Amino acid sequence: MFDSTLNPLWQRYILAVQEEVKPALGCTEPISLALAAAVAAAELEGPVERVEAWVSPNLMKNGLGVTVPGTGMVGLPIAAALGALGGNANAGLEVLKDATAQAISDAKALLAAGKVSVKIQEPCDEILFSRAKVWNGEKWACVTIVGGHTNIVHIETHNGVVFTQQACVTEGEQESPLTVLSRTTLAEILKFVNEVPFAAIRFILDSAKLNCALSQEGLSGNWGLHIGATLEKQCARGLLAKDLSSSIVIRTSAASDARMGGATLPAMSNSGSGNQGITATMPVVVVAEHFGADDERLARALMLSHLSAIYIHNQLPRLSALCAATTAAMGAAAGMAWLVDGRYETISMAISSMIGDVSGMICDGASNSCAMKVSTSASAAWKAVLMALDDTAVTGNEGIVAHDVEQSIANLCALASHSMQQTDRQIIEIMASKAR
């Protein structure tokens, strides 16, 4: 719990980070459906015999090609089945952390028997939507999640409505901590990072602990596309230099390899995404280690990275056609620039160069190849920092980048929020045609 005597704005920053930076086991879109199924199963009278689920097109996109931890299988059906048969309804994004070998076997058997179906919800105006309905004979329970990966808005059984969330904030309720980010600036975030007591932000070191463990697993195992392990081998062969730049890419992509390959270790997520959490964490950790930073400097750099990533992502839809590893890496660029230089000008220049570099990267669903995009984003972030240290950056005379970094961020987010909606529909259409 943080010090209540802190500046109220700083309290809201800390609350925003605590809300958005959480442990998550498995890719968060399938996990969101697994959570809905687990909560529904907890409400059901008797064991689950059948599972029906409906998801938004975006959630379907991000669930088609990703491995569910511990199962060796990809896709939403196994996530729904395992959530229903082995999920911990009280564990949030770690819903599958207690799944046993027997539960996994039972989930696969349920799937093989044709007792699990997952369809796109039509019509669906929500970007993030999952609904799971579980059956025992004629008895059933249904749970709906909307807007956020763990935001349960409705629980119903054959006996009637158990819970429904109010659509709006009523008088006397506090607004979401994220709301304050729409009224803040990067300069204010930097002031907070520089001046907040270390004790109030020490908790962010947990992101380094979790994501470093995931990175180590990625280097030691044959996970996903094993990009990190492959690049490390090429260093040993002399085909790639073993330096700070390659270490950033190797250790960051290794964590994503393990994450997307189905390792049973949690990631510390950011904005509902494990890969965003990895991208906001690992480059900063590697640079901090290179410079021998102590825990306090690491915590401040991680707080700047994670809060900047949240600040940018708060201007985006929760899921979109824009690969959000890029925006998380903008946070990482801020954190790395702070470690090396500390000046606002260096941080803002690095972010501007990132927007001029990787802003066109699309999200074509969660899969092993996400680690490729994570590695690209991490590399671009360090390149942008190196440019900024030499007083060089993409300027407001070029493309969507503006002279002011805040406007550059707004321009990027406007593209993702509006113009790229058709891109998203085309991506989903292509992926759906492959699945048929």
UniProtKB/Swiss-Prot annotation:
Signal peptide: none annotated. InterPro entries: Ser_deHydtase-like_asu, UPF0597. It holds the Pfam family SDH_alpha. GO terms for biological process: L-cysteine catabolic process to pyruvate. One of its GO terms (molecular function) is L-cysteine desulfhydrase activity. Belongs to the UPF0597 family. PANTHER family: UPF0597 PROTEIN YHAM. This is UPF0597 protein YhaM. The lineage of its organism: Bacteria, Pseudomonadati, Pseudomonadota, Gammaproteobacteria, Enterobacterales.
